[in-house]
Swiss-Prot record:
UniProt-recorded name of the protein: Aspartate carbamoyltransferase catalytic subunit
Binding site for carbamoyl phosphate: R55, T56, R105, H133, Q136, L265, P266
Gene from which the chain derives: pyrB
Reactions mediated catalytically: carbamoyl phosphate + L-aspartate = N-carbamoyl-L-aspartate + phosphate + H(+)
Record text on subunit structure and interactions: Heterododecamer (2C3:3R2) of six catalytic PyrB chains organized as two trimers (C3), and six regulatory PyrI chains organized as three dimers (R2).
Organism this protein belongs to: Aeromonas salmonicida (strain A449)
A GO molecular-function annotation: amino acid binding
Signal peptide: none
Length: 306
């Protein structure tokens, strides 16, 4: 079978089709069960993080090394020639000449797409501002499939910051290809953007808006939590909003035994630590799955057959 991701840039989740996503999930599942240390043998990946990152950068570097590849790069754009005024286009041209693929995070929206236009090797977006974070979506899809055994027809709630959270935008767009039903739970000021809702309506995807988690809890297969960003509100308003969207043990009353809680992390106060010990909590395993999803994507982008 032809590998459709071979030598492909992955900048946005919309760059991938449903079969592409299913291929990444299946490959991640296989690599988690049967590690293969040869898939990136003799491959050199450039890890270019112009913006600080913990989980994304370390999981990519772990993924490369566990597949037998080598990695070069930087974790702080302030220590590169960008500080001297070098353009991103020039930087990527040079970095691409040293490597087989570039993994990049950048604070500016659209930076990854720009980089792909000047790179002779595949560029994988590790996050560009509040725009896109496709590999987070892929690890979310893998985690959902791992816990539910499928992606089709699930009931998924998104809670918290639905306006600025790039993870919820991308995941909603991806899951819309699998005919899932969505429940949006957020402060009015942080509601899901109109363009996402309009896109879902055009596709015939069912979604509804709610004020509390409790009113939909019994229906859910996946509860996707996000943090309300403190910096976007004054102290009084933040405390009011944040307190309204905290997941506690009592909130979980009536949940399906198979329901799982996901969170892109970092967690602040929106999930009580007591929830960590319940069988519903899956956010730490979700973060671990980032290694396998990124292994799968790198292997597919850099190998004609996997």
């Amino acid at each position: 079978m032809t590998n459709p991701l071979y030598k492909k840039h992955v900048i946005s989740i919309s760059d991938l089709t449903r079969p592409d996503m299913e291929l990444v999930v299946a490959t991640a599942q296989r690599l988690k069960a049967e590690p293969d240390t040869r898939l990136l043998k003799d491959k050199l990946i450039a890890s270019c993080f112009f913006e600080a990152s913990t989980r994304t950068r370390l999981s990519f570097e772990t993924a490369v090394q566990r597949l037998g590849g080598n990695i070069i790069g930087f974790a702080d754009g302030g220590n590169t020639s960008a500080k001297k005024g070098e353009t991103l286009a020039d930087s990527i041209k040079i970095i691409g000449s040293y490597s087989d693929a570039v993994v990049m995070r950048h604070p500016k929206e659209g930076a990854a797409r720009l980089a792909s236009e000047f790179s002779r090797v595949p560029v994988i977006n590790g996050g560009d501002g509040s725009n896109q974070h496709p590999t987070q979506t892929l690890l979310d899809l893998f985690s959902i499939h791992e816990t539910q055994g499928k992606l089709d027809g699930l009931n998924v709630a998104f809670v918290g910051d639905l306006k600025y959270g790039r993870t919820v935008h991308s995941l909603a767009q991806a899951l819309s290809l699998f005919n899932c039903r969505f429940f949006f739970i957020s402060p009015d000021a942080l509601a899901m953007p109109d363009y996402i809702c309009e896109e879902l309506e055009e596709k015939g995807i069912r979604f509804s808006v709610h004020e509390t988690m409790e009113e939909v809890m019994p229906e859910l297969d996946i509860l996707y939590m996000t943090r309300v960003q403190k910096e976007r509100f004054d102290e009084t308003e933040y405390k009011h909003m944040a307190a309204k969207f905290v997941l506690e043990l009592a909130t979980l009353e009536g949940a399906k035994p198979t329901m799982k809680i996901l969170h892109p992390l970092p967690r602040v106060d929106e999930i009580d630590v007591a929830v960590d010990k319940t069988p519903y909590a899956y956010y730490f395993q979700q973060a671990e799955n980032g290694v396998y999803a990124r292994q799968a994507l790198l292997a597919l982008v850099l190998n004609e057959t996997v």
